Protein backbone atom coordinates (compact mmCIF):
# COMPACT_ATOMS: atom_id res chain seq x y z
CA UNK A 1 0.00 0.00 0.00
CA UNK A 2 2.80 2.40 0.90
CA UNK A 3 4.61 1.78 -2.38
CA UNK A 4 1.38 2.42 -4.28
CA UNK A 5 0.84 5.69 -2.44
CA UNK A 6 4.39 6.75 -3.20
CA UNK A 7 3.85 6.06 -6.90
CA UNK A 8 0.60 8.01 -6.87
CA UNK A 9 2.27 10.92 -5.10
CA UNK A 10 5.16 10.88 -7.56
CA UNK A 11 2.70 10.94 -10.45
CA UNK A 12 0.76 13.80 -8.87
CA UNK A 13 3.96 15.77 -8.30
CA UNK A 14 5.01 15.18 -11.89
CA UNK A 15 1.66 16.42 -13.20
CA UNK A 16 1.80 19.47 -10.97
CA UNK A 17 5.31 20.30 -12.17
CA UNK A 18 4.20 19.97 -15.79
CA UNK A 19 1.26 22.29 -15.14
CA UNK A 20 3.54 24.86 -13.52
CA UNK A 21 5.98 24.71 -16.43
CA UNK A 22 3.11 25.28 -18.84
CA UNK A 23 1.76 28.12 -16.72
CA UNK A 24 5.17 29.80 -16.61
CA UNK A 25 5.25 29.81 -20.40
CA UNK A 26 1.72 31.22 -20.62
CA UNK A 27 2.36 33.92 -18.02
CA UNK A 28 5.54 34.99 -19.80
CA UNK A 29 3.61 35.29 -23.03
CA UNK A 30 0.30 36.74 -21.86
CA UNK A 31 0.82 38.06 -18.33
CA UNK A 32 -1.31 37.08 -15.36
CA UNK A 33 -4.36 39.02 -16.55
CA UNK A 34 -4.17 37.76 -20.12
CA UNK A 35 -3.67 34.15 -19.10
CA UNK A 36 -6.50 31.70 -18.45
CA UNK A 37 -6.88 28.22 -17.02
CA UNK A 38 -8.00 27.06 -20.46
CA UNK A 39 -4.82 28.40 -22.06
CA UNK A 40 -2.65 26.85 -19.36
CA UNK A 41 -4.43 23.51 -19.77
CA UNK A 42 -3.90 23.63 -23.52
CA UNK A 43 -0.20 24.34 -23.06
CA UNK A 44 0.14 21.49 -20.55
CA UNK A 45 -1.89 19.00 -22.56
CA UNK A 46 -4.55 18.61 -19.87
CA UNK A 47 -8.20 19.54 -19.55
CA UNK A 48 -9.16 22.66 -17.56
CA UNK A 49 -10.79 20.34 -15.03
CA UNK A 50 -7.48 18.61 -14.43
CA UNK A 51 -5.84 21.96 -13.70
CA UNK A 52 -8.60 22.87 -11.24
CA UNK A 53 -7.99 19.63 -9.36
CA UNK A 54 -4.57 21.03 -8.44
CA UNK A 55 -5.11 24.79 -8.33
CA UNK A 56 -8.10 26.90 -7.36
CA UNK A 57 -7.45 29.55 -10.02
CA UNK A 58 -4.72 31.05 -12.16
CA UNK A 59 -3.67 33.36 -9.33
CA UNK A 60 -2.92 30.31 -7.19
CA UNK A 61 -0.75 28.96 -10.01
CA UNK A 62 1.07 32.27 -10.32
CA UNK A 63 1.59 32.35 -6.57
CA UNK A 64 2.99 28.81 -6.61
CA UNK A 65 5.47 29.74 -9.33
CA UNK A 66 6.58 32.84 -7.48
CA UNK A 67 6.81 30.99 -4.17
CA UNK A 68 9.06 28.35 -5.76
CA UNK A 69 11.22 31.08 -7.26
CA UNK A 70 11.59 32.81 -3.91
CA UNK A 71 12.57 29.57 -2.21
CA UNK A 72 15.39 29.14 -4.73
CA UNK A 73 16.42 32.75 -4.16
CA UNK A 74 16.57 32.24 -0.40
CA UNK A 75 18.60 29.06 -0.84
CA UNK A 76 21.17 30.95 -2.92
CA UNK A 77 21.39 33.78 -0.37
CA UNK A 78 21.62 31.35 2.55
CA UNK A 79 24.50 29.54 0.87
CA UNK A 80 26.38 32.75 0.09
CA UNK A 81 29.27 33.49 2.39
CA UNK A 82 29.55 29.95 3.72
CA UNK A 83 33.25 30.06 2.91
CA UNK A 84 33.70 33.17 5.03
CA UNK A 85 35.04 32.32 8.47
CA UNK A 86 33.39 33.49 11.65
CA UNK A 87 35.94 36.26 12.14
CA UNK A 88 35.21 37.84 8.76
CA UNK A 89 34.00 41.40 8.74
CA UNK A 90 30.33 42.32 8.32
CA UNK A 91 31.40 44.14 5.16
CA UNK A 92 32.54 40.86 3.60
CA UNK A 93 29.24 39.27 4.51
CA UNK A 94 27.33 42.23 3.05
CA UNK A 95 29.22 41.84 -0.23
CA UNK A 96 28.51 38.11 -0.35
CA UNK A 97 24.80 38.35 0.43
CA UNK A 98 24.15 41.32 -1.85
CA UNK A 99 26.01 39.67 -4.72
CA UNK A 100 23.97 36.50 -4.14
CA UNK A 101 20.51 37.99 -4.62
CA UNK A 102 21.66 40.25 -7.45
CA UNK A 103 23.42 37.38 -9.18
CA UNK A 104 20.37 35.15 -8.84
CA UNK A 105 18.15 37.59 -10.70
CA UNK A 106 20.85 38.53 -13.21
CA UNK A 107 21.20 34.86 -14.15
CA UNK A 108 17.45 34.14 -14.05
CA UNK A 109 15.55 36.94 -15.80
CA UNK A 110 12.32 34.90 -15.84
CA UNK A 111 12.45 34.86 -12.05
CA UNK A 112 12.88 38.62 -12.18
CA UNK A 113 9.66 38.81 -14.15
CA UNK A 114 7.87 36.70 -11.58
CA UNK A 115 9.37 38.43 -8.59
CA UNK A 116 8.65 41.95 -9.69
CA UNK A 117 5.56 41.49 -11.81
CA UNK A 118 7.24 42.92 -14.90
CA UNK A 119 4.67 41.15 -17.04
CA UNK A 120 2.09 43.55 -15.63
CA UNK A 121 4.02 46.77 -15.34
CA UNK A 122 5.56 45.84 -11.97
CA UNK A 123 2.17 45.83 -10.25
CA UNK A 124 1.00 42.81 -8.17
CA UNK A 125 -2.33 42.49 -9.96
CA UNK A 126 -4.36 39.35 -9.51
CA UNK A 127 -2.87 38.24 -6.20
CA UNK A 128 -4.84 38.36 -2.97
CA UNK A 129 -3.54 40.63 -0.24
CA UNK A 130 -2.73 37.64 1.95
CA UNK A 131 -0.78 35.81 -0.73
CA UNK A 132 1.00 38.97 -1.80
CA UNK A 133 2.07 39.64 1.80
CA UNK A 134 3.33 36.07 2.20
CA UNK A 135 5.40 36.31 -0.96
CA UNK A 136 6.74 39.73 0.02
CA UNK A 137 7.81 38.27 3.36
CA UNK A 138 9.85 35.59 1.59
CA UNK A 139 11.47 38.21 -0.63
CA UNK A 140 12.29 40.23 2.47
CA UNK A 141 13.80 37.11 4.05
CA UNK A 142 16.33 37.03 1.22
CA UNK A 143 17.25 40.67 1.89
CA UNK A 144 17.45 40.51 5.69
CA UNK A 145 21.05 39.21 5.78
CA UNK A 146 22.20 42.42 4.10
CA UNK A 147 20.26 44.46 6.63
CA UNK A 148 21.80 42.47 9.49
CA UNK A 149 25.28 43.05 8.07
CA UNK A 150 24.60 46.78 7.85
CA UNK A 151 23.60 46.82 11.50
CA UNK A 152 26.73 44.88 12.38
CA UNK A 153 28.66 47.66 10.66
CA UNK A 154 27.26 50.12 13.19
CA UNK A 155 23.98 51.35 11.74
CA UNK A 156 20.85 51.47 13.85
CA UNK A 157 17.80 49.55 12.70
CA UNK A 158 16.18 52.44 10.85
CA UNK A 159 19.35 53.49 9.04
CA UNK A 160 20.12 49.88 8.12
CA UNK A 161 16.63 49.50 6.68
CA UNK A 162 17.03 52.69 4.66
CA UNK A 163 20.41 51.67 3.26
CA UNK A 164 19.17 48.17 2.46
CA UNK A 165 16.15 49.62 0.67
CA UNK A 166 18.43 51.86 -1.39
CA UNK A 167 20.70 48.91 -2.16
CA UNK A 168 17.77 46.83 -3.32
CA UNK A 169 16.29 49.66 -5.39
CA UNK A 170 19.64 50.30 -7.05
CA UNK A 171 20.06 46.62 -7.85
CA UNK A 172 16.56 46.24 -9.24
CA UNK A 173 17.09 49.26 -11.47
CA UNK A 174 20.26 47.75 -12.89
CA UNK A 175 18.59 44.38 -13.35
CA UNK A 176 15.73 46.01 -15.22
CA UNK A 177 18.15 47.83 -17.50
CA UNK A 178 20.02 44.60 -18.15
CA UNK A 179 16.82 42.62 -18.66
CA UNK A 180 15.47 45.08 -21.22
CA UNK A 181 18.83 45.60 -22.88
CA UNK A 182 18.76 49.34 -22.19
CA UNK A 183 22.08 49.22 -20.38
CA UNK A 184 23.82 48.56 -23.70
CA UNK A 185 23.15 52.11 -24.81
CA UNK A 186 25.53 53.23 -22.05
CA UNK A 187 28.11 50.56 -22.76
CA UNK A 188 28.03 49.45 -19.12
CA UNK A 189 27.87 46.14 -17.26
CA UNK A 190 25.13 45.76 -14.64
CA UNK A 191 27.10 43.46 -12.36
CA UNK A 192 30.15 45.72 -12.36
CA UNK A 193 28.01 48.74 -11.54
CA UNK A 194 26.28 46.89 -8.71
CA UNK A 195 29.57 45.69 -7.26
CA UNK A 196 30.89 49.25 -7.39
CA UNK A 197 27.80 50.50 -5.56
CA UNK A 198 28.29 47.95 -2.77
CA UNK A 199 31.96 48.87 -2.40
CA UNK A 200 31.12 52.58 -2.28
CA UNK A 201 28.44 51.87 0.33
CA UNK A 202 30.93 49.99 2.50
CA UNK A 203 33.56 52.72 2.18
CA UNK A 204 31.00 55.39 3.04
CA UNK A 205 29.91 53.53 6.16
CA UNK A 206 33.50 52.98 7.23
CA UNK A 207 34.07 56.70 6.89
CA UNK A 208 31.35 57.37 9.42
CA UNK A 209 33.57 56.05 12.16
Placement of each model-derived feature along the sequence:
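Helix-turn-helix
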Residues: 18, 26-60, 64
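Amphipathic alpha-helical packing segments from all-alpha helical-bundle domains
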Residues: 77-78, 92, 114, 125-154, ...
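Amphipathic C-terminal alpha-helical segment
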Residues: 103-107, 148, 165-186, 201-209
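Generic hydrophobic, amphipathic alpha-helix propensity
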Residues: 15-23, 40, 65-77
